[in-house]
């Protein structure tokens, strides 16, 4: 079977004006663009790894329109990912793997998508990228923030150009930024909810700033310039349990503003949900080693699900499809800055 990947040296006709839902017809599938610039080492940008997260694509379109009649400051390679899911406005289609879980290092079984991501990494390895930025949206109430997979001064400097809020994580495996961390400083940038012009503008300005960098500093980031957090667990809801928000008649009825807890340091005893007729903890929390650690972070008390210890959530969402396809969210703790 042939590769899913298309490559193009240049900007396909109509790309800069196309809507995300039009890209499957316009491009024919996932596409890697290579554009020349004054500095040869390319900035790599990935977009639409989730088909309903459109800010990355819109930021790239705006950026390239800005440079339509002038030379890019640096070469640029752009990966446009799950265009089939984008046609339907979905994170991924039924039967598709998650495009941000199948990069080298993944736990997922072999698939055409997994082979494609390995191909993208190998192509870019030969081009020696300057830096890598994967642009995402999320569905809950979150600030704009940057994620890194290595505690490294260059990674942190690049991330701090986007936000003072930085998150270090090594799970889930198979994400784009972790695969590219072996090649160059690599980030995931989270730009808030889809459809917010501030997120698109922030992403475009950041990508433009990256194109103008001649080098990335390798000295320590000043402690007063960043807040660094560490993802300590991914939280899932087992399929055996029904769930809802507010006053739903379900097994787990979360508070209706659960997503407003994101990036807030919650004290022990914070109530998250009412539990109906369940004795065991109804959440799974998986730590960096892959161990189930829900009892470390949660307890049931008077039919209420509460935090056992101080913790900070991120990406808690009210979107039931996202929760089933991915997770409820993440738990974080503060992380010391390296010397």
Please place each PLM-identified region on the residue numbering.
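Structured catalytic-domain cores with a bias toward divalent-metal coordination
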Residues: 1-339
């Amino acid at each position: 079977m042939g590769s899913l990947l298309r490559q193009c040296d240049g900007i396909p006709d109509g790309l800069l004006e196309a809507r995300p839902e039009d890209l499957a017809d316009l491009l024919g599938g996932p596409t890697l663009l290579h554009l020349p610039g004054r500095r040869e080492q390319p900035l790599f940008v990935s977009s639409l790894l989730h088909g309903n997260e459109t800010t990355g694509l819109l930021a790239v379109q705006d950026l390239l329109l800005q440079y339509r009649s002038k030379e890019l400051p640096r070469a640029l390679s752009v990966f446009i990912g799950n265009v089939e899911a984008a046609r339907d406005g979905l994170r991924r289609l039924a039967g598709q793997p998650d495009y941000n879980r199948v990069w080298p290092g993944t736990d997922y079984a072999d698939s055409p998508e997994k082979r494609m991501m390995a191909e993208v990494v190998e192509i870019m390895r030969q081009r020696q990228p300057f830096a890598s930025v994967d642009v995402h949206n999320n569905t809950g109430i979150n600030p704009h923030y940057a994620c890194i997979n290595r505690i490294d001064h260059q990674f942190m400097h690049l991330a701090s150009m986007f936000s003072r809020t930085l998150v270090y994580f090594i799970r889930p495996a198979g994400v784009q930024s972790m695969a590219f961390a072996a090649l160059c400083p690599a980030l995931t940038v989270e730009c808030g909810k889809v459809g917010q012009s501030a997120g698109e503008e922030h992403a475009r300005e950041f990508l433009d700033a990256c194109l103008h960098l001649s080098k990335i500093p390798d000295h320590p980031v000043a402690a007063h310039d960043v807040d660094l957090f560490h993802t300590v667990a991914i939280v899932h809801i087992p399929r055996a349990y029904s769930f809802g928000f507010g006053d739903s008649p379900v097994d787990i009825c979360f508070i209706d503003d659960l997503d407003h807890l994101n990036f807030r340091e919650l004290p022990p005893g914070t109530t998250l949900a009412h539990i109906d007729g369940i004795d065991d903890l109804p959440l799974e929390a998986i730590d960096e080693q892959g161990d189930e650690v829900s009892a470390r972070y949660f307890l049931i008390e008077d039919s209420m699900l509460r935090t056992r210890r101080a913790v900070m959530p991120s990406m808690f969402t009210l979107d039931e499809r996202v929760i089933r396809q991915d997770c409820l969210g993440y738990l974080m703790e503060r992380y010391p800055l390296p010397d």
